[in-house]
Each structure stands twice: as structure tokens, then as C-alpha cells.
Amino acid sequence: MATQKKKTAGRKKTSTRSKKKKSASFRLEITGAVLIAIGIIGILQLGFVGRGFFALAEMFVGLLSYVLLAGSIVLGGYMVIRRKMPHLFSKRLVGVYLIVLGFLTYIHMYFIIHNLGANAPVVSSTWKLVLENLFRPNQVGFVGAGMIGAAITSVTYFLLDRLGTNIIAILLIIYGFSLVSGISVRQFFSKITEFVRYLFSKGKAAKEKGKEVKAKRDKKKAEKLVEVEADEVIEVSQPIDASKEEKTPPIISNFSSKVEQEKAPLEEKTESDVKEKDLEMFQQESFENEIYQLPSVDILEPAKVTDQSKEYDQIKVNAKKLEDTFESFGVKAKITQVHLGPAVTKYEVQPSVGVKVSKIVSLSDDIALALAAKDIRIEAPIPGKSAIGIEVANQNVAMVSLREVLENNPKNNPDEKLQIALGRDISGEAMMASLDKMPHLLVAGATGSGKSVCINGIITSILLRAKPHEVKMMMIDPKMVELNVYNGIPHLLAPVVTNPKKAAQALQKVVAEMERRYDLFSHTGTRNMQGYNDYVKKHNELNEEKQPELPFIVVIVDELADLMMVASNDVEDAITRLAQMARAAGIHLIIATQRPSVDVITGVIKANIPSRIAFAVSSSIDSRTILDMGGAEKLLGRGDMLLLPVGSSKPTRIQGAFLSDKEVEDVVNYVISQQKAQYNEEMIPDDIPEVEGEVTDELYHEAVELVVEMQTASVSMLQRKFRIGYNRAARLIDEMEQRGVVGPHEGSKPRRVNVELPPDIE
């Protein structure tokens, strides 16, 4: 009985506590709702009650009455949602109080000086204004910071005067921000110091920029004066047409005006069961590094302005000479427009009706003689225009930097990870290309023509746009000096391959990766890399997984000629397979060579790589090997190139973007500082070259027995013994060398046989 009484008493106590708790929470909800209502009605000043609430708030805090009413709404909302009173003296709330007190003090100090007068009694004067405002709000208006502000300011103003009061207000605000943000006062002042230094440096830079702008403005004025003189000279020249045709002066455009324009801003299939191995991809290196930051374009050096004012004098002289030359040969034509480019000036010549284009083209040597130019290039006709272009080299070449091409590109699209910067065309337009639309690129040119700088510009463009999980690279550099600077960047699948014998193996591994990707596509029912990545996104959303997407792979071969000398068959087969099939798998080739002969750039390779860049070459034969047409033999070198993109019938002349070694190192160091390289073991070439499959020649084993027995090896010996041709005998010797049966060729000495004759046979 006693136990039952205790249990009953315990239950009564528990129920009493729960009732009290519910009652307290209910009271808090009611109080919170009332505070919210007061705040909203007061802020909106709804009716007599709303105006009364607002006037009361104004009586206490004056100009900060809206802040007080908003605080009422926040406090009420907290009480309704959390059903408890907040800790009103927590660290952050104390900081808020100090900020409000600081503003109240500063506002009321301002109110005293400008409204009451410096000698007026603070509290009594404020009280009179507050009472008047309470009953006649529309007649008084501004009451400073209310009675709370008056009480604080009266003390500080009496003790510290105006300046001291303002200092106290600022210190209260700073210390309040420190408590709210958790930043110490020392850190706060250090941040302010850094900001002041930043503003000072910006002001200094703006001052220097102003000097540059002034210099450019003076240059433009000089150019306009020269243009006026050029127009006058052209107008005075004799007309070509005998029928008194009215001559219009040519329009002269300058590429530098486009450089100074405003910069452009820059960086699905139903779900099916898929095996885990089909969703694996590059393991760690393909997962997104969320803290990786792309390099800024500011890491590159700004372009140096080149003075080309003298070129305008030459333009008017050349225009007169061209007209005189055409007239002397009986060709009726007129110059309609002149484009001053970075390295070349193009004169657009419009022939009259009945004048054959071939007649003007045949005058190329005479035009070069008249202009005293070392060489000219004639574009007949200009695509999309009824005019012929005569390109003449400038006296002063204006350098085009990679930074200005990236900054002044209106077609810049940060989502295109393989968009590369090439340079500027003759009209001054920034030339960009999308590697995924090319889809492969052949770069050829003589030594010193700018080929390596172009390759560095392409790689740097990709590093500035793409993160390591978005684009991977395989670099092959038999020269061992051009691409080694990129060792260690996280975008590499494997270290830069410098051994020509391993290059074929590296290309075969890329081919194997391509086949693996197509196997993934077949398992997931997708057709290309974009479709597969969309599939993986859906798979991750449905299964809450984080399977990596496939990155682009860019294979860069810096010197194809060296590879073709060492292992031409294997290299050509791998390049051909990649060129034919790799586009849909997201794999793209960039192949460079300085010897554009047919034994290096074979017909099979050229047929499968439609986009080409030709730098200066020594002969028209080399130009035809690259572009299937002449023109590259007339280029100037130092970055002067012809771009023939896929689908285009005529090449575009471009002055390539320059990139210094220091800029390349700066970009590489920044990228490495963001993320270290994590090479894929499966993509690193082995130390020992792979021997593919079994021997297909049925005479191989008999030939090995003969060589071991005779302890000598030669092609002629195999020809005599087996009565076979030279080619077959040479292939057998090469197969034995690859498998280690015989040693390498040593000139006039016989090959060394590495396999000894067994003792019992001796």
C-alpha cells in the first residue's frame, strides 16, 4: 500500500511538472507573438496604435527606432520557435548592444551640434523634443538618438567634449564588431591596415595607368593626323578607270584599337544496373579537389604597347605604289580597305568588272619589287569578300601577349575547358579555338618559327581554364627540353615521356584507355563522353554516390619526327587509331614536328587530323605537306602562322601569342602549389618495351636455331639459307633483336648473338 501511494504521488508530481512546463511554453509563445505584432504594427505605423508604438520607440532610441522594433520581431520569433527565452547577455548579443550604444552616442552627438547647439542642456532639451514628438509627430521630426542616446551623450560630452565622445562611439562600435565576429581588436586593426595599403597600391597603379592612357591618347591623335594625310594622298592619286570614275579613299583599320576595347569577363538514359568496375575512373586523381583554385590571368605579364605610328606613313606610300603598279600593267582595280595588323598589313584590292584574279596574282613579284618588300602573300580572293588581299610585312612587329588575347576575347566561354588562345589575326581579332571541335591538331614549322611557344600557349590556356579532374594530359617530348617544365602538374596522367622507345608504349596505353572508355559507353548505353558523364551525374543523384566523371585527355607530342625514326610503325598505328576513334571518347591529339616531310606526316596521319597550324617553312613543298596548299613558305617567322581549322577551305593568318619562360614557370608553380601530381600507374610506360603477342612468321624459330648454331646473324645469311626476300629476312632479324636473341646493329661489325649454343650440341 505504501509503495502504491509513493507511485501515485510521483505520477502527480510528474504531471504537475509537465503542466507547468506546457503553461510556461504557452506563455512564451503568447509573449513572442505579442512582440512580433508590436514590431510589425510599429514599423508599418498601422493606425493610432502603430503610430503610438513607433513614437514610444522613437522616444527611447530616436533614429534607431526601426532597429528597436526589428529587434522586437526577432526576439518574438525566437520565443515562438524555440519556446524559451534567449540568453540576453551572451557574448554576441553584448556585442550587438555595444554597436547600438556606439551608434546612439554618435547620432546624438551629431544632433547636439547641428540642432541644439554646443551649450544647450542635453537631457532636458531632448526630453522637450521627445514629448512634443510624442503628441505632434509630424511637426518635430528628428529627435536624435532619443533619451537613451541623450543620457549617454550628456555624460561623455561633459567629460570628454565632442572629439572624445566621437572616439568613445567608434571604440564601442569596433569592440562590438569584435565580439560579434569573433575577431580580436588587434586582428581588426591589422585588416584595416592591409586594406589601406591595398587602396594605396591601387591608387599608385591607377596613376601609372593614367600615364599610359595619356600616352595612348597622344598616340591616337598622331595616328588620326597621319590618317588625314594618307586620305589626302590617296585622293590626289590618279584614277585607274579612264571613264572618270570617282575614287573613294581606303578605310584604314588598326588592330591596336581592338586591343584597347573593353575586356571580356573571364576562369539524358534511364538508370540500369552497372557493375562497379564500369564506373571506376582514374581513382583519386579524377575526383574533384574542391579547394583547387584556377590560376588568374593576372599571373601572366601584361602586353607592352608597341609604337606603330611609322606604319601609317608606310601605308600611304604603299597605297600610292600599288595603284601606280596596277595602272602601269593595265589592271583596273582600287584599294578599298587597309588593315594594320601586329606583323602584317593587308591591302584589300577590288578589281573592276572583267579583270581576272589570276592577272593580279601573277603580278606578285612585280608588286614585291614596287613595295621593296622581301616577300608578299596574296590571298585571292578573301573569303566572304569580293576583294583580293595583298599582305605586306610591317617594319615594326607588335608583340601579341597571351594575356591580352585571353582578356580581349568576346567569345570567351569558361565552360569550354579546351578553348585555347592562338593569337590575333590581321584585323586584330583575338583568335581562339576549341580543341574538342578540331578535334585533333597538327602543328608544323621550321626551327625558331614559334612552334614551341604555340604549344606552351595551348597548354597554359588549358591550365588557366580546367581543373585537374576536368582535363588530363599525356606529354611526349623526345627533345627532353620543351615540356619537362610541366613535370609535377596534377593534370598529367604520367611523367613527361622523353624516351622515344617508350613513346610508342605510352600511345598504346592511351589507345587502351580509349578502348576502355568505349567499353564503358557500351555498358551504359551512351554514345560519347558527354553522354556518359550525364549518365554518371544521374547515377550519383539517384544512388547518393560520388562516382567520378570522365575527364578530357589531351595527348601532346612535341617532335613526331624523332618518334617516326625509332618506331614508325607502332607510332603511326597508335596515332591513326586515336585520330580515327578518340574524339567521342574525349581524347584529343596535338602533334608537332619541325620536319614536315611525307615520311613523318604520312598520308594516313594527315587524313585523320583535319586541323593544322603551319609556321614558317623553307619550301612550298613543306607547306603543301602541312596545308595541302602553298603559303607557309612566305611567312615571317616569330609566331607568324596559318591556321586551317576543320571545315575551312582557306587558312587564316595569325600572329601567335607570345608566352615567356618565366610566365610558364609561374603558372606551373601556381598549379603545383594548388595540388600535387598523382600519376596513374596504369598509364606510366614500363622500363622494358612490351613485346606484343606471338611471332607470326613460321620461319622465326628455325631462323633462331640457325643463328644460335652459326653464332652469327645477318640478313643476307637468312636470305640464302631460307631463300626468302630481303624484307622478310630483315623483319626476322628485327624480331630477334626485340626479343634479345641478337644484339643491335654495330655498323660494319656483325651482330652479337646473345644466346649461346648448348654444350651437348657443341
Swiss-Prot record:
Return one GO MF term.
Answer: ATP hydrolysis activity
Pfam families attached to this UniProt entry: FtsK_alpha, FtsK_gamma, FtsK_SpoIIIE
Mainly localized where? membrane
The topology of this chain with respect to the membrane is: Multi-pass membrane protein
Q: What is an annotated GO biological process for this record, any one? A: cell division
Family membership, please give it: Belongs to the FtsK/SpoIIIE/SftA family.
Q: What does this protein do?
A: Essential cell division protein that coordinates cell division and chromosome segregation. The N-terminus is involved in assembly of the cell-division machinery. The C-terminus functions as a DNA motor that moves dsDNA in an ATP-dependent manner towards the dif recombination site, which is located within the replication terminus region. Required for activation of the Xer recombinase, allowing activation of chromosome unlinking by recombination.
Task: Name the chain's protein.
Answer: DNA translocase FtsK
Native species of this protein? Listeria innocua serovar 6a (strain ATCC BAA-680 / CLIP 11262)
The gene name on file is: ftsK
